[in-house]
């Protein structure tokens, strides 16, 4: 029974850790550029950054929606986002996720491991993402694999075509088709709803990924520059060499609580 519980914990951990990369594919430059080999972070550099026009710095509540495969239940992931100078910070709580194929006990098990809350800090110029876990007071760096990450804004051009006018979350919007082209001729197409009362901020973005429409909704948008400290890992947290090392140490602690030998973390 003990080993069965540990196996369920491991399965839950892997399932939860794979959630954000699925959404990151819609935001990380070339489609699939982030994939499973990239960090589970939201990248607002590259082609994605062009969609925000003259609004490079902001904070907002964000909700990401992704339909399940073969007509499965839509997964919804809410969180908070802060963006400045191409850097981004995304905060999420596993307890607030809905739908998808997440195990029913996922939230409680992640909370027991101290991994229910997760913060990703994406630094495109450094090609690094920090995975931060407040419940563990720990973090780990991950190398960004998005080839667009460090490209200057001048390498991208955007063309928009008006599709109509709609209201989104109380904001009057112009619905546009947006096509971003990089210096290699690669094109990324999205549908965006630019709020005319928010300096044309895109309060809704839709893009296609593997035949599915992925959606981002932004609420409580503030067009002010976030504090620079938000884009740095907490100084008092333990730093691991890799996310794998962090996960392994967390699993060993969990197994130790169940009566198995617990290995102390490497300093």
Indicate where each model-derived feature is located:
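Extended soluble regions of mature proteins
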Residues: 26-267
């Amino acid at each position: 029974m003990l080993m069965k519980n540990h196996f369920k914990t491991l399965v839950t951990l892997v399932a939860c850790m794979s959630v954000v990369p699925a959404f990151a594919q819609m935001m990380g430059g070339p489609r699939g550029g982030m994939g499973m080999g990239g960090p589970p972070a939201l990248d607002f550099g590259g082609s994605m950054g062009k969609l925000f026009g003259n609004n490079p710095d902001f904070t907002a509540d964000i909700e990401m929606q992704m339909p399940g495969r073969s007509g499965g239940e839509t997964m919804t992931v809410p969180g908070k986002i802060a963006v400045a100078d191409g850097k981004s910070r995304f905060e999420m709580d596993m307890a607030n996720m809905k739908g998808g194929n997440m195990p029913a006990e996922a939230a409680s098990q992640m909370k027991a491991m101290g991994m229910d809350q997760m913060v990703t800090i994406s630094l495109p110029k450094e090609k690094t993402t920090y995975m931060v876990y407040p419940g563990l007071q720990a973090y780990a760096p991950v190398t960004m694999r998005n080839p667009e990450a460090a490209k200057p804004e001048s390498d991208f051009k955007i063309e928009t075509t008006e599709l109509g006018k709609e209201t989104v979350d109380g904001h009057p919007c112009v619905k546009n088709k947006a096509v971003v082209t990089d210096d290699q001729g690669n094109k990324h197409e999205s549908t965006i709803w630019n709020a005319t009362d928010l300096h044309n901020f895109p309060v809704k973005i839709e893009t296609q990924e593997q035949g599915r429409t992925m959606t981002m909704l932004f609420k409580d948008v503030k067009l002010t520059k976030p504090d620079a400290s938000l884009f740095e890992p907490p100084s008092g947290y333990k730093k691991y060499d890799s996310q794998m090392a962090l996960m392994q140490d967390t699993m060993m602690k969990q197994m130790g609580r169940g009566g198995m030998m617990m290995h102390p973390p490497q300093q």
